[in-house]
Amino acid sequence: MITVFVQEHPVRLKSWHDLSFIDGFGRVFQVFDHLISGNLGFGVENDKGRFFIKYAGAPTINYLGSGEDAIERLHRAVQTYQVLAHPAVPALLGVEEMPQGLACVFPWVEGYPLGPLPEHFFAMRQLSMVDRLS
């Protein structure tokens, strides 16, 4: 595991990945680097407001697949976001192809990420393979 910095925020990765593109979105105020989806999340702020950037392509620490797999999954998710357009779901505001990944832009919503908590994921990874599969 290595730590790279996005602005002043540490981002834990399996190996180095260029994240300098995020500067173009604004000032980073939050980083989500512990997700099991293969994505990184960034809370950014600029003169237009606050936004959530979902990025696939970096070697995230809790994802067992490749960056290419994560990019493909996010491409498929973009299609779902477009079909799922509903007032209760944060709107997909934009999609940007990056040299090494894919970034999706959403409005920032106060809260916390849904899904498995990192401590549960860590505890499961400590189990033997037999116990994990049972």
Per-region residue spans from a language model:
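Juxta-kinase regulatory segment immediately upstream of eukaryotic protein kinase catalytic domains
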Residues: 1-29
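Conserved alphaE helix
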Residues: 129-134
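ATP-binding glycine-rich loop module of kinase domains
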Residues: 37-79
